[in-house]
Amino acid sequence: MVSPPAITISNLTKSFGNQEVLRNLSFEVPRGQTYCIIGGSGQGKSVLLKHVMRLLLPDSGDIRIDGESIVGLSGASLDDIRKKMGMVFQESALFDSMTCLENVAFGLTMHRRDLSAVEIERIAREKIRLVGLNRVETKYPSEISGGMKKRVGIARAIALEPEILLYDEPTTGLDPVLATSIDELILKMKAELHVTNLVITHDMNSAFRIADRILFLYQGKIHFSGTPLEVRETPDPVLGQFVRGETSGPIPVIAEETSP
């Protein structure tokens, strides 16, 4: 029997007031693949990610994780699905009052009541080493660099050994060298942990490095879906303008308002 895709989005529609953000959106993410969602600000990328996490409910359509619809789930059933997913937030979202070790152990403490404190600490230390960090366990987030915070965030996301990793702008705020190192870590996690990755990003260099497939979200729809090579070579004027970062083309540029 063929396994279902890790993530299936079917005819997903979401509006806020009179603004339709997602319009009849459909795509699948096969197991073990890395899919990058690109698109301009306000195009619905974060809204889409919140639906996958079931932080938002669609107006219509369906979201399936491992073939199971999550739209109607609640309570323990929803918690079980969420344990299959690890989230890496844009700003790392570490707890300032906790050490790095405590941050990584947080999910284990909350969801693995069957584990002793010693076992939880062992797993947390193991995940910290896996993301390439040393001697940060007793440090607080304010005492480490932005790149290290990203790694601690990834360590926390993999602590419960999820099947799916969701990344929200993982290279934002990093210099090119650190951004490349995070991309390499994402690829390492995919290879060693056999996870499926869904990545929201504005960083085209990152998308080209890590993606098996890139989906371009524009005006609430998947405007283009293709491999990194297909995206690079696309004749599509909308996608081409976005990828090249050009100000002239079909995508309007909104000028910043200035004070009188």
Whereabouts are the PLM-identified features?
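Helix-to-loop junction immediately C-terminal to a conserved catalytic motif
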Residues: M53
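Conserved ABC ATPase "signature" region
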Residues: E68-S69, A117-R135
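Short helical segment in ABC ATPase nucleotide-binding domains corresponding to the A-loop/adjacent helical element
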Residues: L101-T109, E121
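Conserved ABC ATPase signature
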Residues: Y140-I144, M148
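A short, proline-enriched helix->beta-strand linker immediately N-terminal to the Walker B motif
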Residues: A159-E163
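Catalytic Walker B motif of ABC-type/P-loop ATPase nucleotide-binding domains
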Residues: L165-D168
